[in-house]
Amino acid sequence: MACPWKFLFKTKFHQYAMNGEKDINNNVEKAPCATSSPVTQDDLQYHNLSKQQNESPQPLVETGKKSPESLVKLDATPLSSPRHVRIKNWGSGMTFQDTLHHKAKGILTCRSKSCLGSIMTPKSLTRGPRDKPTPPDELLPQAIEFVNQYYGSFKEAKIEEHLARVEAVTKEIETTGTYQLTGDELIFATKQAWRNAPRCIGRIQWSNLQVFDARSCSTAREMFEHICRHVRYSTNNGNIRSAITVFPQRSDGKHDFRVWNAQLIRYAGYQMPDGSIRGDPANVEFTQLCIDLGWKPKYGRFDVVPLVLQANGRDPELFEIPPDLVLEVAMEHPKYEWFRELELKWYALPAVANMLLEVGGLEFPGCPFNGWYMGTEIGVRDFCDVQRYNILEEVGRRMGLETHKLASLWKDQAVVEINIAVLHSFQKQNVTIMDHHSAAESFMKYMQNEYRSRGGCPADWIWLVPPMSGSITPVFHQEMLNYVLSPFYYYQVEAWKTHVWQDEKRRPKRREIPLKVLVKAVLFACMLMRKTMASRVRVTILFATETGKSEALAWDLGALFSCAFNPKVVCMDKYRLSCLEEERLLLVVTSTFGNGDCPGNGEKLKKSLFMLKELNNKFRYAVFGLGSSMYPRFCAFAHDIDQKLSHLGASQLTPMGEGDELSGQEDAFRSWAVQTFKAACETFDVRGKQHIQIPKLYTSNVTWDPHHYRLVQDSQPLDLSKALSSMHAKNVFTMRLKSRQNLQSPTSSRATILVELSCEDGQGLNYLPGEHLGVCPGNQPALVQGILERVVDGPTPHQTVRLEALDESGSYWVSDKRLPPCSLSQALTYFLDITTPPTQLLLQKLAQVATEEPERQRLEALCQPSEYSKWKFTNSPTFLEVLEEFPSLRVSAGFLLSQLPILKPRFYSISSSRDHTPTEIHLTVAVVTYHTRDGQGPLHHGVCSTWLNSLKPQDPVPCFVRNASGFHLPEDPSHPCILIGPGTGIAPFRSFWQQRLHDSQHKGVRGGRMTLVFGCRRPDEDHIYQEEMLEMAQKGVLHAVHTAYSRLPGKPKVYVQDILRQQLASEVLRVLHKEPGHLYVCGDVRMARDVAHTLKQLVAAKLKLNEEQVEDYFFQLKSQKRYHEDIFGAVFPYEAKKDRVAVQPSSLEMSAL
């Protein structure tokens, strides 16, 4: 074969004479008209034409008519440049002219109607296996082109050597069908391939690549030795050096040398029996392959997988990497000491091992190479990707961020700190690493150099923009052109998917299923499931919720019923009432809001359901209500639903269930759910009902296992507001006590305090008159100290600890998310409820830690409903009193942190107007104290009221605002109002009159007639806000003030309902019937019942309505949101015998226990 001179040199594109514009690349003057960034259609047409010309090389040397010396002229600088694509930096305004793309090889994945630029491994960047050598006629042009490229890289032309090399390569291909690169050519090719890598941000170092030529090795053992040398050289005690080891080139595709690992060093990922993954999830498949090949797994989080090496096409061999070669960096944070507790680490050497080097038509499928890490590769991708180690939420939680709220930007804060930790850890151990900002800056410098030196720089914007910081890095604003040049590093198909095994016994068990088969199997399974579900009884599960608790339980119920039924979970506001006629089984899970009202998303269904008169379809139903026995109408909305469905003729499947927030709510739900499920199976005659396996959630036992929990020391400082925000899923903020004043007379045996809270910046305060403030209180120090003195085997009270629990498989420890890292003292003070009587479930667990048999038996007896109810209502014991009653209890810190219930916020009506006091919130609080055992027992104190009464000025108060949309002032201020509130029931009305005063003085808005009805014992004892009321009356804000005194000496008791009956009957009728007025009631439940009863009597008498008509009349008033009730209170054990729904008469405190 003669030397193919036509492939030796190609024509270079002629420049077109242009004047005016400065060319960034070579400073040639351009025409002023060529300034637009977009590529025109003419540009594209010319580019296609020039590409065709480029791919059809023209002969540069005619048969012997020109001497070789004349070829030297071809290297001279041309007079003009070829057409270009303009690349602009939108940050700096600088532009580049890309001409290098004319030398691009192949076609990228983009299509005319779709862009595939974000595909991870597109076909255009992937080389598959071969089953025969590259044909010489395909290989020769590529080889000559590479030789030209190689000799063109010299500053001075070496014409004779160049021609001789072309001749030698030609003859070698003609003789052997392939050719071998010289050592210098190999070095040039590997560096040039790095230079051409469009997805690499660190190419500024391309010329410093160390090349190890391992083309002479023939066995896997030799490959391993070369790799060990490579790792040792590159690691360099932390001063990382970039290097590449090149194994023999591909011949016929049947004798490849390949490294099966994706990277030389990588961590194993283990698929655990419970479905969880231990280690790096990205490596689960490869780890299983290693195990199948004989590797013994260690099941750690950071186990280095062995090298799997294939030599000369033979079956792969496993080699453990010597531990002394693997430099690892333990992660720590410069500020957060707890970061060490995450026990994170990462290897220092990022060595890619599974790519293919293409150069001059030759392919090297084994060529591991490395640079050094950019911090975000570890800190963002390896640690934070959800499909990798996924530590983001754990770090955010430990930082005390609002991980439940995306808008808090907790992810952004956490990922920054993780990356700070990575950079700090590497730098502290003197291991090479580069931050992403420096990397982006270096790439911009490299890119500018490349455009000036060779007129282009292939770059993949999607890969080069770092995974964090986005537009604050310069590469974000840089337009880029992506194309493939030769030499190039290509992706490869995983070796184990294409390898032809010589020893079938060593072949790993095939787990893959062909895509067609898999798709058919999935479709078939879906079809079967649809048929199965269609044949099952349909169940509709409705929920209404304010906080999300009912929704969560509804989905849990759906999971249970999916074992034998076809369930559908629907929010009440999405449910069409007409569907009731098609139901067979309806389940309802709902909470009760306020004074027996339904949650907001249940209002629509409630209105339409309660107006329904009859139902033709007599379906089965069951209802579960959630609430707190502290509220006056416990689970009232659920009871209303239950009764209405029954009146419509539906059949109750099981008795209505109740879940008390203060007494084992979830246990009650699980018990009701299982009972309902079993009843449904019986009723609908479900086949195989005896063998149905229900979810583990419903079968958990009540045993206490101390080995299931452990405490780990933690140094993270507690941010109380952030911790409470996370626990209660609320935006908890901190206010400070400005002042506290006792509103009752010094001679009174009781106390009602005005608590004024303030904050520096009132912008965060956003509330309307009538809304509530949730206060997160602290327990009494005496109770906390008493419990601490009885804890066994616990840490010091002020040592910060973190509770960890074994995962379900019992394989490893996970942080318990119920509590933040804190000291035991902090937990007992701010997070755990130590005043509510223990539930029956907690008593069962306490029985297991009693060391005296009589006490254990007594605790077990108390778990029986009758005994428990008597003991609870008689003693109402705090947790400390339980420990004192049963002194043999050996309670550990782990027991307390894992088993005690969470301390709930307490809610108070706000007694101030934001417009009137912009940086303050006022509360009206009755300080609660009472004796248990019918007044003969120990003195108990209300948790929050006592805590507020003990604060000093400027002490912090964690709190949050809760909306009370049903208790706002009328939208039209001209509408008349009647306000009824005895005792602290006056709290929200103070905010009303302050708002009306502000509107009058600053907006010129005169409100409608506002009548106040207040009640207390005596004017000289507990007539709170008396002077303010008189002032508001004088200023015309309150048009009438009526006070009912119930303890005046020598006079009969007068209550607010008496005032209504005796003095305001006409006013009530005028406001409610003749005008679109509003009536507000705030106070304890018995007062509210008496007031409602009195009002109904008055209206019935005046309008001559019967009982049913008057009930409907007031139902309409509530529906129109003209009759408002805000009724809260706490159940007191000593009043339970008198009234099962007893409340503290004048406290708006959510709980006094």
UniProtKB/Swiss-Prot annotation:
<keyword id="KW-0408">Iron</keyword>
<keyword id="KW-0349">Heme</keyword>
<keyword id="KW-0963">Cytoplasm</keyword>
<feature type="binding site">
    <location>
        <position position="463"/>
    </location>
    <ligand>
        <name>(6R)-L-erythro-5,6,7,8-tetrahydrobiopterin</name>
    </ligand>
</feature>
<feature type="binding site">
    <location>
        <position position="1090"/>
    </location>
    <ligand>
        <name>NADP(+)</name>
    </ligand>
</feature>
<dbReference type="InterPro" id="IPR001094">
    <property type="entry name" value="Flavdoxin-like"/>
</dbReference>
<dbReference type="GO" id="GO:0009725">
    <property type="term" value="P:response to hormone"/>
</dbReference>
<comment type="similarity">
    <text>Belongs to the NOS family.</text>
</comment>
<feature type="binding site">
    <location>
        <position position="118"/>
    </location>
    <ligand>
        <name>(6R)-L-erythro-5,6,7,8-tetrahydrobiopterin</name>
    </ligand>
</feature>
<dbReference type="GO" id="GO:0006801">
    <property type="term" value="P:superoxide metabolic process"/>
</dbReference>
<feature type="binding site">
    <location>
        <position position="547"/>
    </location>
    <ligand>
        <name>FMN</name>
    </ligand>
</feature>
<dbReference type="InterPro" id="IPR003097">
    <property type="entry name" value="CysJ-like_FAD-binding"/>
</dbReference>
<feature type="binding site">
    <location>
        <position position="633"/>
    </location>
    <ligand>
        <name>FMN</name>
    </ligand>
</feature>
<dbReference type="GO" id="GO:0005634">
    <property type="term" value="C:nucleus"/>
</dbReference>
<feature type="binding site">
    <location>
        <position position="372"/>
    </location>
    <ligand>
        <name>L-arginine</name>
    </ligand>
</feature>
<dbReference type="GO" id="GO:0006954">
    <property type="term" value="P:inflammatory response"/>
</dbReference>
<feature type="binding site">
    <location>
        <position position="906"/>
    </location>
    <ligand>
        <name>FAD</name>
    </ligand>
</feature>
<feature type="binding site">
    <location>
        <position position="115"/>
    </location>
    <ligand>
        <name>Zn(2+)</name>
    </ligand>
</feature>
<dbReference type="GO" id="GO:0030863">
    <property type="term" value="C:cortical cytoskeleton"/>
</dbReference>
<dbReference type="GO" id="GO:0042803">
    <property type="term" value="F:protein homodimerization activity"/>
</dbReference>
<feature type="binding site">
    <location>
        <position position="926"/>
    </location>
    <ligand>
        <name>FAD</name>
    </ligand>
</feature>
<dbReference type="GO" id="GO:0001666">
    <property type="term" value="P:response to hypoxia"/>
</dbReference>
<feature type="binding site">
    <location>
        <position position="110"/>
    </location>
    <ligand>
        <name>Zn(2+)</name>
    </ligand>
</feature>
<feature type="binding site">
    <location>
        <position position="943"/>
    </location>
    <ligand>
        <name>FAD</name>
    </ligand>
</feature>
<keyword id="KW-0479">Metal-binding</keyword>
<feature type="binding site">
    <location>
        <position position="1017"/>
    </location>
    <ligand>
        <name>NADP(+)</name>
    </ligand>
</feature>
<feature type="binding site">
    <location>
        <position position="628"/>
    </location>
    <ligand>
        <name>FMN</name>
    </ligand>
</feature>
<feature type="short sequence motif" description="DINNN-motif; mediates interaction with SPSB1, SPSB2 and SPSB4">
    <location>
        <begin position="23"/>
        <end position="27"/>
    </location>
</feature>
<feature type="modified residue" description="Phosphotyrosine">
    <location>
        <position position="575"/>
    </location>
</feature>
<dbReference type="GO" id="GO:0043457">
    <property type="term" value="P:regulation of cellular respiration"/>
</dbReference>
<feature type="binding site">
    <location>
        <position position="909"/>
    </location>
    <ligand>
        <name>FAD</name>
    </ligand>
</feature>
<feature type="binding site">
    <location>
        <position position="377"/>
    </location>
    <ligand>
        <name>L-arginine</name>
    </ligand>
</feature>
<dbReference type="Pfam" id="PF02898">
    <property type="entry name" value="NO_synthase"/>
</dbReference>
<dbReference type="GO" id="GO:0034618">
    <property type="term" value="F:arginine binding"/>
</dbReference>
<feature type="binding site">
    <location>
        <position position="984"/>
    </location>
    <ligand>
        <name>NADP(+)</name>
    </ligand>
</feature>
<dbReference type="InterPro" id="IPR017927">
    <property type="entry name" value="FAD-bd_FR_type"/>
</dbReference>
<dbReference type="Pfam" id="PF00175">
    <property type="entry name" value="NAD_binding_1"/>
</dbReference>
<dbReference type="GO" id="GO:0045776">
    <property type="term" value="P:negative regulation of blood pressure"/>
</dbReference>
<keyword id="KW-0560">Oxidoreductase</keyword>
<dbReference type="Pfam" id="PF00667">
    <property type="entry name" value="FAD_binding_1"/>
</dbReference>
<feature type="binding site">
    <location>
        <position position="772"/>
    </location>
    <ligand>
        <name>FAD</name>
    </ligand>
</feature>
<dbReference type="GO" id="GO:0018119">
    <property type="term" value="P:peptidyl-cysteine S-nitrosylation"/>
</dbReference>
